[in-house]
Regions:
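Conserved N-terminal phosphate-binding loop of PLP-dependent enzymes in the Aspartate aminotransferase
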Residues: 4-6, 10-492
Length: 492
């Protein structure tokens, strides 16, 4: 009998712990088998990676190329650096001066080259980041050199640089009549709300200062209404830089209430259905191009093994299954369209993939060139108070939310996309851009250039078909080509 009660206690403890053990195993199996799916592991590993700096002699011969090829690379890079420095002295000087005081530029400049090459090559080749003007989808630096804009200002530019100038001008002129009116609303608010509700299919709207803030508010509302803490995001997806949705490398805080799961996985759906602590699931439709991987970046050029694969039907089925799982579990499905909003169509990813979210977050694209964040959602999810408990509220404020210039910018953007011309562009976008990508790929193949392009409408990326350690040098070569194009245009 002396062992009876200890055995009972042990058995009881085992029974109580068993569901948690099963739950933990289930969660572990639902994570993507990569560092992107294991935030804490990647964060800890990053702290142990030692510095590696190649010398000038090593930088161009790491692939065992003959000395003649290495010499050509060295000479080409040196020539490019000299040409860019001599052709853009004012731009280079201004950029260097600004980087001493601007922490953002200092950080970006440090990681413009792959880390092992950065210390040596960044001193030789310094590019400009200060611009004089833009026009016709080109950027002009302080020295008059022109560059094609293929980045779209981090996703803001949907309509083209020149299309935004009249929108910004009109919104500024209208905002001047009321000045910095904050706390109230301008007369544009009615048409803006009508337009946002129509395009999103939602009941209510809230305004914020950035896409990151919009996602923060949507998550806060989901937690408020579900009384749960956990967030589900998918491997590789970006939802802004605040702690709860950007775990891992770059965030000094340990991963807290976020699960990073494998997208397009039945195991992820099982986790969502079975747990009772998940408040919301965040989906970035951009991931349809590269499921469970980070968006293509300079670091991807090191290996050149990146391949894009977009299957509209498969991703549609995934979103519909995810929608059903969230509904069954009482979990909010949040579409993060801060980048993708109004690229795939007037109803965004909801219309393109045929799925209805509980809340949609917009930013970047929607304000006609002005900074903004917007949350659109159903009445239940957007309510910030409990009518039966007056002190039970969900707080959200922002001094510059619904700024007159921003609201006017949204109005003019919505008017622009509702024109017959833009409506037709949306209707033909899939065919138009696929034809363009096919034409480029045919040209590359006919000229034996080992690259191809792939994408989703206006969002596209380059794939390298032959492995190389030096694909990233092509970015620098493009700067040299821009320089040559400017000189050629000046001679004509």
């Amino acid at each position: 009998m002396s062992n009876f009660w200890p055995q009972v206690a042990a058995a009881t403890a085992s029974l109580l712990l068993f569901p948690k053990v099963v739950q933990r195993i289930q969660l572990s199996r639902a994570k993507h088998r990569s560092l992107a799916g294991h935030s804490l592991m990647s964060k800890n590993l990053a702290r142990w990676i030692p510095p590696l700096n190649y010398s000038a002699r090593e930088c161009f011969g790491l692939d065992g190329a003959p000395q003649s090829v290495v010499s050509q690379r060295q000479a080409g890079f040196k020539s490019l650096a000299h040409r860019l420095a001599s052709e853009s002295p004012r731009t280079r000087e201004a950029t260097q001066h600004v980087s001493l005081a601007l922490s953002d530029l200092n950080f970006v400049s440090r990681y413009r080259f792959p880390i092992p090459f950065a210390q040596e090559l960044s001193q030789q080749l310094r590019v400009g980041a200060v611009w004089k003007e833009s026009g016709d989808n080109q950027l002009v630096d302080l020295d008059g050199r022109r560059f094609w804009d293929v980045t779209g200002s981090f996703g803001v530019n949907v309509l083209g640089l020149d299309a935004y100038k009249p929108l910004m001008r009109a919104s500024c002129e209208e905002a001047l009549s009321v000045g910095p009116l904050l706390g109230g609303y301008t007369g544009d608010i009615e048409s803006v709300l009508d337009g946002l509700r129509r395009h999103s299919g939602m009941d209510e709207v809230s305004f914020h200062m950035s896409g990151t803030e919009a996602v923060m508010q949507a998550v806060r509302l989901a937690r408020y209404h579900t009384r749960r803490k956990k967030i589900v995001r998918f491997s590789g997806a970006y939802h802004g830089w605040w702690d709860d949705v950007q775990p891992g490398v770059g965030n000094p805080m340990p991963p807290g209430h976020v699960f990073t799961l494998e997208e397009m996985s039945e195991r992820a759906l099982q986790v969502i259905r079975s747990r009772r602590d998940i408040a919301c699931v965040l989906v970035n439709p951009l991931q349809a191009m590269h499921v469970n991987q980070n968006a293509p970046s300079d670091s991807a050029l090191l290996a050149g093994e990146r391949r894009l694969s977009f299957d509209r039907d498969a991703y549609t089925r995934w979103l519909q299954s995810l929608r059903q799982a969230c509904t069954e579990a009482g979990v909010a499905l949040i579409l993060d369209e801060v980048f993708m909003g109004f690229r795939l169509g007037k109803r965004g990813a909801q219309g393109y993939f045929g799925v209805r979210a509980d809340m949609v977050c917009y930013g970047k694209t929607i304000a006609g060139g002005w900074p903004v964040g917007v949350v659109c959602g159903g009445e239940h999810w957007m309510k910030r108070y409990n009518p039966l408990r007056p002190a039970d509220i969900c707080f959200a404020r922002g001094t510059f939310n619904a700024h007159p210039a921003v609201i006017a910018g949204i109005k003019h953007f919505l008017l622009a996309i509702d024109t017959p011309e833009v409506t037709q562009l949306y209707r033909d976008a899939d065919v138009t851009w696929q034809q363009a990508l096919d034409a480029w790929n045919q040209r590359f193949e006919s000229e034996n250039i080992p690259i191809r392009v792939a994408g989703l409408q206006t969002i596209w990326s380059i794939e390298f078909l032959v492995p190389s350690r030096y694909h990233w040098l092509n970015l620098e070569a493009l700067l040299g080509q821009a320089s040559a194009d400017t000189a050629k245009a000046a001679r004509q």
